[in-house]
Amino acid sequence: MIKNIPSHVNQVELLKIISKNYSKAYNFFYLPIDFNKKLNAGYAFINFKSAKLIINFFLELENQPWDLPNCGNKICYLSYARIQGFRSICEHFEKSNIMKQIDDKVKPIIILD
């Protein structure tokens, strides 16, 4: 789980940061949106295909300032999410109303290999 994301950052911007070094490393990504404010909720979920990659991702991003404009002094934090594992995550979100949204930019990204 990625925390303390600046609220104005959108899915595309966050994925650019992640994809610099981890473009093929994950199979699930979701940046929840506050539809009333039209901003992200400040956190995102990512599932890595390999647990080994989490260590590198953690060392690269944990406690680092966001490398994006207008982020002030916000620092990136990482933690484990309540739901773990690709299958469990997919089962959880397939029941979610977010999957009924028309705009793909607000839905979770699920990558099937």
Provide a role label for each language-model segment.
Residues M1-A41, K49-K74:
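Canonical RRM/RBD RNA-binding surface and closely related RRM-like beta-sheet modules
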Residues E13, A51-D113:
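Catalytic "initiation/cleavage/transfer" segments centered on a nucleophilic residue
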